[in-house]
Amino acid sequence: MLISSDSVNRLAEYVENRDEVFCSGLFLSARWMIVSQLDHIGIQMIILPDRDSAEYCAADLYHLIEGDRVYFLPDSGKNLERSNYKSSLGVQRTSAIGKILEYKEGEQVIVVTYPSALEEVIPEKGRISGSLLKLTVGEERSYEDIKEILFSSGFERVDFVSEPGQFAVRGALIDIFSYSFNNPFRISFFGDEIESINIFDANTQLSKEKVEYVDIYPDLSSSEDEEGSMVTDILPADTLVWMDSSDMYKDRQFFQELNRFRRIYMELPLSRQDEEAVRFNISPQPVFNKNFELLTDDIR
């Protein structure tokens, strides 16, 4: 798939100088190639119609972009029964929210989400900061202090951790399964000093990686407090938002909140014929229905 560098350069220029930019001729995965080529500094949030389309987009971007820069922000699955899938949604949501809160100027971060995930209330920023447990190799921290913070953040003490929201104490070790990571952490102490921090496999108990510090997040996937915050409340002012169309979400709760951010619309709405739209002129992939003769003719 060939994408004109002139169109990408024009898009980058418009993004720097306009509050909203309209595109035309962008189809399917070509959109995510454009996102990967834009090389934008800051947070980019891609809002798609539903969970399935957002998951597919995130999967494409994982392959297109190197490093841990892509985050999927799903809903909390609060109406689902307890399961590994619901637990996975909570981890991904907390991880994405945590990354937004930890964002440092100059980073490149992409968050993929959808309306129902944006409209769920999250804890207020102050409450999140108060329940965040930061641990660093070499610092002095008492067992009791750590256990008290974990209990107050809703963590459950168990014999062996197996899922997010659990911790275990064994001798000079504390195992903690954070809500923002797919594997638990093993904190090793020498007296009251943190001697080492290891990421380990909960099934095999084998160490996977040694790290120098860790941020242990409680469950940020939703909030029981109706007066909590929205995800849009914690986004930096220079966030760049991608959406399908300006017409698609205009009646949704979150849409008006997005007016304070720069926006890229990946479709030119019927209500607007903008001669200044960035045109990519990419044709949608034909449907061949396993007819290889048609496929051969198309390639030729």
What is each of the regions a protein language model found here?
Residues M1-R300:
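ASCE RecA-like P-loop NTPase motor cores
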